[in-house]
Amino acid sequence: MDIFREIASSMKGENVFISPASISSVLTILYYGANGSTAEQLSKYVEKEENMDKVSAQNISFKSINKVYGRYSAVFKDSFLRKIGDKFQTVDFTDCRTIDAINKCVDIFTEGKINPLLDEQLSPDTCLLAISAVYFKAKWLTPFEKEFTSDYPFYVSPTEMVDVSMMSMYGKAFNHASVKESFGNFSIIELPYVGDTSMMVILPDKIDGLESIEQNLTDTNFKKWCNSLEATFIDVHIPKFKVTGSYNLVDTLVKSGLTEVFGSTGDYSNMCNLDVSVDAMIHKTYIDVNEEYTEAAAATSVLVADCASTVTNEFCADHPFIYVIRHVDGKILFVGRYCSPTTNC
């Protein structure tokens, strides 16, 4: 969650959407070629492939792909190549067709949601390009009925509101909790997809209460909040929305502790025969949330309620909120902030 916190704090008032799964995959590739303190810093982001396979095997459309493109004239070390296996391909970075081919690969894989990944021709000094793309599409276990979708005010701030298409369902059973913390009170609800993934939505009690929650959104806290959920009959209202994102993650990752990974400080002596540096890390994302399903992409996812009461509560996301798409084992696939209905739509 630390990467999301850094991006959110630097983009106040803007929608944010990232895929920790995709980011970790690229950092894992760098780890395989790193040495010394660079490898030590990257080690906490190492992604185990079986974790991704576990998600892919469920009854959802989830795909992940990692590709490593190396300069054809460079000599890459056998130990590095063994670790990345068939993900590696040599290319001519000075050929404009190389960029077109890479963009086409990502475009097809994400079903047209990320295009282009690379906007500019690469520098002739480029030695290696590592990309990771993930695609997720899943139907809600309990779909929203379109007849209940209507225009509804969304409060961007206590004094500003805009109309959104608000999806609604009534009297259904979902895992829900009202959480009270020293930094603020909020509600959290789990909206399951068919299969073993779900969307967690974190909604502050106060219209302007999201920032303090973001600042305290750690993996430990998030797990604690999820463990507090209880099955509840509840009316749910969340906006339909589409969000796209484009980020150069270098500054964010440096602030997150990767101080010896980028630029001249990085040690990638286990990668190839050249003195290489990582100068950019581009992360592009897309999400579409509607009545039937959630579709998400990134390049760099039957509750039986045992309720003692039939009193119906309400969860109305009519002001800024955080949403997390995760697997049942706790793996976070995507995390985002929705706060600006007039942008990224």
Curated annotation (Swiss-Prot):
It comes from the Viruses. Coiled coil: none annotated. Pfam families: Serpin. It is found in: Host cytoplasm. This is Serine proteinase inhibitor 2. The gene is OPG199. Belongs to the serpin family. Poxviruses subfamily. Viral serpin that inhibits both cysteine and serine proteinases involved in the regulation of host inflammatory and apoptosis processes. Major anti-apoptotic protein which inhibits both intrinsic and extrinsic pathways and strongly cleaves host CASP1 and CASP8 but is a rather poor inhibitor of host CASP3. Prevents the proteolytic activity of host interleukin-1-beta converting enzyme (ICE) and ICE-like enzymes. Can also block apoptosis through host tumor necrosis factor (TNF) receptor. GO terms for cellular component: extracellular space; host cell cytoplasm. It comes from Rabbitpox virus (strain Utrecht) (RPV). GO terms for molecular function: serine-type endopeptidase inhibitor activity. The keyword Magnesium does not apply. GO terms for biological process: symbiont-mediated suppression of host apoptosis. Keywords: Host cytoplasm, Host-virus interaction, Inhibition of host caspases by virus, Modulation of host cell apoptosis by virus, Protease inhibitor, Serine protease inhibitor. The record marks 306-307 as: Reactive bond.
